[in-house]
C-alpha cells in the first residue's frame, strides 16, 4: 500500500467522545508503523433553535437551544496492511460518526 493515504473524518456532538476516539485511532496507527498527521480540529458547526414557550400569547417568552457538531480530521500517510486491519477492528464510541476515504 505504498503512496496511499487514509483520510478519517470524525463527527460528534460531544467533544470528549471525539477526542477520545481520535486518541485511540492515532495510537493504533502509530503502533502499527504508519505516519499520522493530525488530529486537525475542523470548524465546529453551531445550530441554534428558538422555541416559543407559551402555546398562545406571550411572544417574549422563548427558549433557545444550541447543537454543536465537533469535527476532526486525521491523515494516515503510508499505511501498512497491519494498520488497515487494526483500524477495521477498532471499536469506537457509539456517538461518533466515522468517514474513511482512501486516496
Curated annotation (Swiss-Prot):
Q: What is this protein called?
A: Small ribosomal subunit protein uS10
Q: Does the keyword Ion transport apply?
A: no
Q: Which UniProt keywords apply?
A: Ribonucleoprotein, Ribosomal protein
Q: What InterPro entries does the annotation carry? A: Ribosomal_uS10, Ribosomal_uS10_CS, Ribosomal_uS10_dom, Ribosomal_uS10_dom_sf
Please name the GO terms that the record assigns under molecular function.
structural constituent of ribosome; tRNA binding
GO term, biological process aspect, one: translation
- UniProt xrefs under Pfam families: Ribosomal_S10
Q: Which domain of life is it from?
A: Bacteria
Subunit comment for this entry? Part of the 30S ribosomal subunit.
Q: Which PROSITE patterns match?
A: RIBOSOMAL_S10
Q: Which family does it belong to?
A: Belongs to the universal ribosomal protein uS10 family.
**Any one GO CC term of the record:** ribosome
This molecule's function is given as: Involved in the binding of tRNA to the ribosomes.
Q: Which Gene3D superfamilies match?
A: Ribosomal protein S10 domain (3.30.70.600)
Q: Does the keyword Nucleotide-binding apply?
A: no
